[in-house]
Amino acid sequence: MQSVNIVSTNYSRYGVSVYDRLYRKDKNVSAKHRPSSTGVYGHDASTVDHASRSNNNLNLTRSTSAISESDDVATISTNNSRRSVIKRKYKSLITASSKKLITKLYEHGSNSDSFSIFSHKTSQSHHPAQRLGTEEDLIINDLFKRKEISDLPDEVLRNILSNVKDDQRTLVNCLYVNKAFYNATKPTLYERPKFTSTYRVAQFVTSIRTNPQNGLYVRELDLSKLKNGSLNGKSTSNTGVVADSPDVDEYNPMRTRTGSVTSFTSVTSTANSNTALSITTNNKDVALAGWRDWRYRHDPLYSSPVLNSYNAKRTVSRAPSIKSSHSSSSLTLFPGLKSKESFAQLSEGKSSDNGNNGKRQRSNSSVSSITNSLMSSLYNGSHISLNTTLSGSDNNSSKTQSKGKSSSSPGNPNDSSGEQDSIISSSSQIDTNTFGMTSSKSTSSTSNWFRMKLHGNGTRKLRLRSNKAISSKKDEQQNEESAQTAQKIETPIIKRTEPFSTPHPYTNKFLLKYAQYKDLPLGYILHILDHCPYLYILDLSNLTLCTDFEIIEGRRYKGRKQRFGSSRALPVVQESVISTDVPNDLDVIYLTDSSKTYEYYDRLRNTNKHKRSSSSNNLWSIPNQGWSDAPAPIGSHKNDLRRTHSQTIGRSNVELRKLNASEIFEHIATNQKSAYNTHLRVYMKNVLWCTQDMVKSFVLENFDQQAENLGEDKSSEMFIHDMNFSFENSGLNRNFVWTCEGNLQEFIAMVVLDEVNRKDDLEIENLFNIKAERILTPTNGPERAPEVHYISNVFTVSYGFQSNKKREMKFRVTILKTDTPMYFSIKKLADDYTSVVIKLQTNKNVALHGSETADIITTDQGSVLPEDVPEDNNADDTNNGENTIAQPFSNDPKERIERITQEIVARLKDLRGSDLRRNIGENNYVRERFLL
């Protein structure tokens, strides 16, 4: 690094450029750039100059005595002497780095922006420094500086934003404030997502699969309010936005670069009357998109915006008006143009008769009408007419060309002749007339233009001459045309960075038949449960599941992007070849993750089963193969060919496994974190895919995870009280015992008692030791306490989500007598079994339909409770000294437990009475034979 030579102690002059004072040829420049007599801090300029000279007197020669002390440069007589004196006087400045700096200053000039630091210092050094205040004021401002809300910690911002957690629109807007708000809002927004559209749920699944860290924020998920795609009581306008729809964001998609709404007018009044298309609920041809539209988002047939239901309906309604308007304009311009012969006659300057037309040909107006309708359907806002756009640009071009003609000089070799200008003007007018503008020229110019188009030689010559004429003025005309066109026609731009700038899309017309469904594929639910381990509140009420399959490969290779030739190793990963974006590069785990259908994978599976390796040598026998995937010719690489061919065959070994709804319960019970699993809340109301075995396995699996904590301390029993489930009105039979809402302890009691109640009489006799010979044997059971009514042996309850992975859990049921209301508890008294203790009120019997005991129907699927029954006021208040109360059907789990217990006790009484009668009969028979 070059050393710095300090030539003066006046630091205020360091920013002043010395180039103008020392090296400019004009001597008066130094006077202009000389600083004022008073410096920045009040010192005299002559004093500063004198000090500067005194510090450098060792570097000066005797020739400096001839220079006046009042001025450093102005007293030099000639240029030669001035330069030599300057070199000697400022020798300390003439270093290697200084020479380079002076050269750059000379090249760029003193006012160049390349050295903005010098120019900034120069402009600021001439002005005195303005102090902001005293030191006390500065200290006070530093100490009492106001803090902004963005300076708060993230934890405090999260607590503030949690007050608006129910307003998702406000939370989304907070993401766009700054980085601090983004970091604080993101966990709050993902904590409780809410959805009413299956399309948004599919997007959410792709989002958490692409960014797994977002799934860690999810705590609650409510899918009970999903709606179908039908427009219920809502109408759509030409802006493409559904009014009063919670799923559709209110915005205007047609915005200009400045943010104003762009308005476009149609060519004719007929087209203008049909621009606004109103679609009501009576029209079933328009619906909002669902998860199937998101699944086929990369398919060119289903993802085309032209083919969605709204644009397709609008295109059909606008096509007749556009066709009529353009056909009228074309007939006005070319009244005799109806066939090929008339077209040829028109090119020769003749007119054709209206009669004797052999075939009707498609005119340019019909083609333009179709193109116009398709292009205008790309926009969901105001109808953009191609006629207006193109005609405006053509008018500007014609004006520019005429202006260039008048300003051209005859001596210019690049100047065009009069014939050329007439051709350019006629061609521009023909283009204008083609798009519906009125013509001011005669029919002769039109015929000349057609004749020029028909004859190739003339066309080539005219194009060459026209290109020479336009080449000299091409840049000027292009700039002028773009400026004039931008004033009249503003390009519509949608601001994607704004929140809620994208409305809810419409479904494809080929997927319109699924608009009435509000189902979700089973694979999406499993993806959510896998990527949201801290989810502890899940609401799947009113949800319909769509059949889904898991794709299983027979051979798995390490590495997702391993290729053989131009193909991927697995057909699962082969889906990501379609697009290069990140969401499409995800692994295909379930069938709904891919845009391929079931038939595709089934055909891929059957190909490997029915076709041998010899038959696979044919290129067409391998599904989804192209010429680029064909192996290399047989030659020196024969071994590589065989290896690639064998791997291609193994790649087709694909199996499909149908998913079961029980896997939802399995994922909830096994994939959740233990810290949040203790507070788990699952709601599955009004669902048909929930069965008895699913609920039993789900309840026992959660209890097994918490069973090791039971019995250690009393506080651990509170864990099972915090886990709540709801299965109201679920299952094919909605009157099962478990179709209610309660905590884990209540469901365990209902499941165990229901398991006992489902046994036959012989099993119950063995379970509760009803037979006399077993009662007389003291070794078969423990001694009974006086308050013990019935006690069972230890029995096992099998459960499991899969038939080949069944597990067992041991229980013992104890029924005690009490005069207080019913109470139950679940305790783990030993390591090998769990005790279910029920204290039953003995002086109370639950009677339905006037019966003595509860009328509970026992089936193979479990105990079924009867429907609601009104109270029987005519029933006797006393029945053998016991109160009989007729109670209606209730969703209270404690009442259900009491009813099942009463049913078990009633069956035990009947079995004991029959056994007693049988024993009495046997005793009488033995006594009679003994007497005889």
From Swiss-Prot:
Domain F-box positions: 146-193
SUPFAM superfamilies in the cross-refs: F-box domain (SSF81383)
Chain intervals for the UniProt region annotation (Disordered): 29-63, 346-369, 389-450, 470-500, 863-893
Any one GO biological process: signal transduction
Biased composition annotated in UniProt, kind: Low complexity: 53-63, 395-431, 438-447
InterPro entries: F-box-like_dom_sf (IPR036047), F-box_dom (IPR001810)
Polar residues compositional bias, start-end: 346-358, 876-890
Coiled coil location: none
Record's keyword terms, sorted: Ubl conjugation pathway
Job description of the protein: F-box protein probably involved in ubiquitin conjugation pathway.
Descriptive protein name: F-box protein COS111
Native species: Candida glabrata (strain ATCC 2001 / BCRC 20586 / JCM 3761 / NBRC 0622 / NRRL Y-65 / CBS 138) (Yeast)
Gene: COS111
